[in-house]
A protein has these predicted regions:
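GNAT-family acyltransferases
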Residues: 1-51, 64, 68, 109-140
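Glycine-rich acyl-CoA binding loop
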Residues: 54
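Conserved GNAT acetyl-CoA-binding A-motif
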Residues: 67-77
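Conserved beta-strand-loop-alpha-helix junction that forms the acyl-donor binding cleft
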Residues: 76-86
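Conserved catalytic-core motifs of GNAT/GCN5-like acyltransferases
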Residues: 77, 95-109
């Protein structure tokens, strides 16, 4: 299921293993002219956190953006203190690009934001790793 809000498309995430809705993930900061977007606004309930849910959801969005929409860059960003998000980005093949200091104010606190990306020339290798992992996991 999806909901389109201006410059964001939000998808409901359903876990087949848990047989229920477990969260949301979005494509944000969509720049169609430049064929760039960001994967963000990610939220999962406790039962889905640190499971295959995020990894597989991100893979589906990357596949859509690179293979269907022919995008050339997809980014991921997070607060520098959000170590689980930074680790997830790197494990999924996003490359660290740098940190913007004093990038945002969230809940009254100035935050520094780390940026990661996958570009189109890297996509085939990243995609192959994801697909091989899924084949091993589900023994397809």
């Amino acid at each position: 299921s999806q909901e389109h809000q201006g410059n964001r498309i939000t998808f409901a995430v359903f876990s087949k293993r848990l047989n229920k809705y477990v969260g949301n993930i979005s494509i944000t900061f969509i720049e169609e002219n430049y064929r760039n977007a960001e994967i963000g606004c990610v939220w999962y309930e406790k039962s889905a956190q640190r499971t295959e849910v995020n990894r597989e959801s991100v893979f589906l969005l990357l596949k859509y953006l690179f293979d269907e929409m022919n995008y050339i860059r997809v980014q991921w960003r997070c607060d520098i203190e959000n170590i689980p998000s930074k680790n997830a980005a790197e494990k999924m093949g996003f490359s660290y690009e740098g940190t913007f200091r004093n990038y945002a104010i969230f809940k009254g606190k100035v935050r520094h934001t780390s940026f990661f990306s996958i570009i189109s020339s890297e996509w085939v290798e990243v995609k192959n790793k994801f697909e091989n992992e899924l084949l091993r996991k589900y023994k397809v």
